[in-house]
Amino acid sequence: VREDRVLLRGGRLEDRLRDCIRELAAGPLTGGVPAVPERTTLKRAFLDPWGLAWLDFNRGLLGRRSPGDYEEWLAVASLVRTVCDNFPEIREIRIMVEGQVVVSLNGYIDLEEPLSSDDFPLMPVSGGF
């Protein structure tokens, strides 16, 4: 479910990204389970000249207690859409954990290539993710 929040837009891109990820990890305002584990923090971010953002998270991103295909889809889709939809200068993202590119968070979604909002429609495609 899409949720709107107001964050200050000033400052460095890395700081603004960190604020967005912190809000995402805080969970929905209406209650419910956060899309990413609450201990998730963005350690570093780098934007290349072509609009690819490299996002380096702490191990908290891998800390899902009951990993499954939907939980992983929700986490990755939420990260991608939160970043790409709110930062026009970012077209795609790559997810890293502790400075290392990860193949997948829990074995379900391939993270070896850059991801964009086009990869994650607002609702899962019928019959799978």
Which residues are covered by each model-predicted region?
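Bimodal "functional hotspot" detector
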Residues: 1-129
